[in-house]
Design a protein with these regions (language model features):
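N-terminal Rossmann-like FAD-binding beta1-loop-alpha1 element of flavoenzymes
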Residues: 9-36, 176, 182-192
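Glycine/Thr-rich phosphate-binding loops of Rossmann-like dinucleotide-binding domains
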Residues: 22, 149-150, 184-185, 190, ...
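Glycine-centered short loops/turns at secondary-structure junctions
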Residues: 31, 194-196, 226
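Short hydrophobic core segments
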Residues: 11-14, 119, 134-144, 176-177, ...
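C-terminal structured domain segments across diverse proteins
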Residues: 235-262
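Conserved acidic residues
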Residues: 17, 118-120, 180, 233-237
Length: 262
């Protein structure tokens, strides 16, 4: 590919998630001079605040059940009551950094120029990355999206699915708002890690669209395990009293907790 108009790059990508990285690498292998910018961590949602850290959390939480099951096979195993949150976070972060490094290496190997910083468009061919300005013939915006908090009183006291992976300490009691598979999975994860868990869903039963028998069985099992379930209600507001959050439900109930994921 031949550059025209003396641009710095033939092709520039804003956003180094899985799509942006893939697009930039393919363009570079076809002969284009390519640049890419990312203001957070390279790899996008899945690597940093999605599939990977969530599965690491699920893996860690699953150990508690193994300790209990081992007793039935003759093992004298005492299940620990407390998870060392600092050790867990260090392990999680190390794995994510390893994957960040792999993505960085793939870009370098393909000959893509990587910029770490916030990119914005100045005109159809000019990109500003913090204090650096570059030009490109073609520009791809691959920035993805960010979670939006509910417009309720006290929403600033709630966390999004991005925030939940950066907790400084393990929640003692977490309230999860929602009934999709992500919310239900987080309920099981934090329960397995030893946190008290409440889940609030606006419908009759979570996991809408899944097999009804599975949904009912899962509800019964979660109740049996001690997960506090609330249906036909939604989060109406949040008040903070020192280290305690008071979650007001549309049903009129109030849940006291220290962490709210909505």
């Amino acid at each position: 590919m031949t550059q025209t108009h003396n641009y710095d790059f033939d092709y520039f990508v804003i956003g180094a998630g899985s799509g942006g990285v893939r697009s930039s690498r393919i363009a570079a292998t076809l002969g284009a001079k390519v640049g890419i910018a990312e203001y957070k961590d390279i790899g996008g949602t899945c690597v940093n605040v999605g599939c990977v850290p969530k599965k690491i959390m699920a893996y860690a939480a699953d150990y508690h059940g193994h300790f209990e099951d081992a007793k039935g096979y003759g093992w004298d195993v005492k299940a620990p009551r407390n998870l060392d949150w600092g050790t867990f976070i260090t392990r999680k972060d190390a794995e994510i950094k390893r994957l960040n490094g792999i993505y960085d290496g793939l870009l370098e190997k393909a000959g893509v120029t990587y910029y770490s910083g916030h990119a914005s468009l100045k005109d159809p061919h000019t990109i500003q990355i913090d204090n650096t300005v570059v030009t490109a013939d073609k520009i791809l915006i691959a920035t993805g999206g960010t979670p939006r908090k509910d417009m309720i009183p006290g929403a600033e006291h709630t966390l999004t699915s991005d925030d939940i992976f950066h907790l400084k300490k393990q929640p003692e009691h977490i309230l999860i708002i929602g009934g999709g598979y992500v919310a239900v999975e987080f309920a099981h994860i934090f329960h397995g890690m030893g946190s008290k868990v409440s889940l609030c869903y606006r419908g009759d039963l979570f996991l809408r669209g899944f097999d009804d028998d599975i949904r009912e069985t899962l509800k019964e099992e979660m109740i049996k395990q001690g997960i506090d379930l609330h249906f036909n209600c939604d989060l109406a507001g949040v008040e903070k009293d020192k280290d305690t959050l008071l979650a007001r439900m549309s049903s009129g109930k109030t849940v006291e907790c220290d962490t709210i994921l909505s």
